[in-house]
């Protein structure tokens, strides 16, 4: 049983990657609960995956440092407390074998108010789950050495770091300076993508061409 937490703040790339991973886990025989804290998204493929929507929030701006409700209202302590309680109650009811956090603690540190209690709840279970961090190929660089140290310290609670990248193309240490502190528990998985849909080429249109999408959740 897998409890998979994901929070998208601006676009939906993080959510779509998490959904792809969740579907693959479900297809492999895992009972997966995907828990999303971002805006509800129509058309999200979740075959075989259970889904739970937390009270949604988003980034107030492109800087991602300030969080807000979907209507732009700043978060208050009551909202944070309520959402944290909902998350912890759900987690304790699930009693998962694996807890996965998308990006955290190497990103989404704005969500410490609920994710640190979640880690504590996991460690307090009679049979603590494996705790896994699932990250994309590049993480946002922190200008603060103290923040990097905090990430490393928080990662002590984790069993493994899954890096969804090909090290021959992009290496995690290129964007995370404290690689030496986490590398013994890190695994490269390769990139996460859905299988190519079946299609029939339409004549010569597009033949020999490549379309590149930058920033869409690869």
Predicted regions and their residues:
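Glycine-rich phosphate-binding loop signature in dinucleotide/nucleotide-binding domains
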Residues: 90-96, 126, 204-206
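A short helix->loop->beta-strand "cap" motif at the edges of active sites that frequently abuts
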Residues: 30, 123-131, 158, 183-184
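Active-site proximal beta-strand in glycosyltransferases
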Residues: 98, 116-137
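Conserved hydrophobic helix-helix packing surfaces used for dimerization/oligomerization
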Residues: 1-2, 99, 210
């Amino acid at each position: 049983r897998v409890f998979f937490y994901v929070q998208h703040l601006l676009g939906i790339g993080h959510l779509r990657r998490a959904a792809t991973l969740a579907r693959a886990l479900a297809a492999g025989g895992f009972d997966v609960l995907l828990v999303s804290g971002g805006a509800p998204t129509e058309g999200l493929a979740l075959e075989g995956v259970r889904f739970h929507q937390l009270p949604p929030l988003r980034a107030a701006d492109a800087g991602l440092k300030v969080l807000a409700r979907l209507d732009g209202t700043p978060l208050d302590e009551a909202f944070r407390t309520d959402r944290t309680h909902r998350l912890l109650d759900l987690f304790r009811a699930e009693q998962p074998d694996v807890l996965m956090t998308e990006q955290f603690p190497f990103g989404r540190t704005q969500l410490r108010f609920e994710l640190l209690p979640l880690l504590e709840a996991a460690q307090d279970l009679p049979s603590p789950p494996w705790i896994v961090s699932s990250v994309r190929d590049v993480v946002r660089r922190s200008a603060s050495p103290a923040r990097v140290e905090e990430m490393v310290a928080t990662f002590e609670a984790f069993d493994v770091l899954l890096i969804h990248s090909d090290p021959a193309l992009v290496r995690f240490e290129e964007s995370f300076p404290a690689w030496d502190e986490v590398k013994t528990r890190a695994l490269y998985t390769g990139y996460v993508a859905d299988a190519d849909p079946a299609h029939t080429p339409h004549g010569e249109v597009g033949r020999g061409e490549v379309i590149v999408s930058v920033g869409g959740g690869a």
